[in-house]
Amino acid sequence: MESNHEGNAIQVIDQVTTMTHLSDPNPKTKPGMMLMKQEDGYLQPVKTKPAPKRPTSKDRHTKVEGRGRRIRMPAGCAARVFQLTRELGHKSDGETIRWLLERAEPAIIEATGTGTVPAIAVSVNGTLKIPTSSPVLNDGGRDGDGDLIKKRRKRNCTSDFVDVNDSCHSSVTSGLAPITASNYGVNILNVNTQGFVPFWPMGMGTAFVTGGPDQMGQMWAIPTVATAPFLNVGARPVSSYVSNASDAEAEMETSGGGTTQPLRDFSLEIYDKRELQFLGGSGNSSPSSCHET
């Protein structure tokens, strides 16, 4: 019994000694040992986790043009590629796209002249290698026939403008407005407008508009065919138009066939005559020689 008590005492002493050593660990001899306090009051050693490995900066991917580039595609195309990936059992969508490109090789060569191999890759002894400098075409960038290699494709015209040199887009080759029977403004005289060339209306304050300031701009139309003259005014010197207001009005009334009011509206000479009379005061005191015949 005594031996058992002695053995238990020695064991307790050893445990106390061990806890004493663990309570004050030497960081130089045991850098990985730490103390953690538990609810029962005992201190237990805990090992620290190893530091995570740093990721290598070495790029293991093949350097080609367009690597890591996002490609936008319509929703229908993306859904179809995803469906083919599941149906063909491929691991990724990129493998499915590669499968599609391999099947479409003849059409690609026919359209572009090159295959699915990257443009910068060069086959050396059966292996593809990336050159450090861009390839230079022989004969100054020309092929065997001497013509420049055309790599651009014809695209549909998405512009809102039309090329004026393209004859298929213009129906009028002269550059003028087409002659059509259009009714611009108000037809005062009820004249058939078939075959007339429309003119833009002129605003107020121009020399071509007759009438008072309260009237709107008028529209003139010139017939394109040889018909009866619309304004039958004989060829006379300019000075004779401003000789007498009554004579000019009478001549315009007789030449118009009874339609006095419309002819007065189109009379430019009478309007200029009256302006000169207002500026000169009276016909006798006017310094100008507008009354001379």
Curated annotation (Swiss-Prot):
Alphabetized UniProt keyword annotations: DNA-binding, Nucleus, Transcription, Transcription regulation
Molecular function (Gene Ontology), one example: DNA-binding transcription factor activity
Record field: compositional bias (Basic and acidic residues): 56-67
Gene Ontology biological process: regulation of defense response; regulation of DNA-templated transcription
Major location (coarse): nucleus
Residues annotated as domain TCP: 57-111
Official protein name in the record: Transcription factor TCP19
Superkingdom assignment: Eukaryota
InterPro entries (alphabetical): TF_TCP_subgr, Transcription_factor_TCP
One GO cellular component, as annotated: nucleus
Subcellular location: Nucleus
Region of interest (Disordered), residue spans: 45-67
Cystine bridges: none
One Pfam family hit: TCP
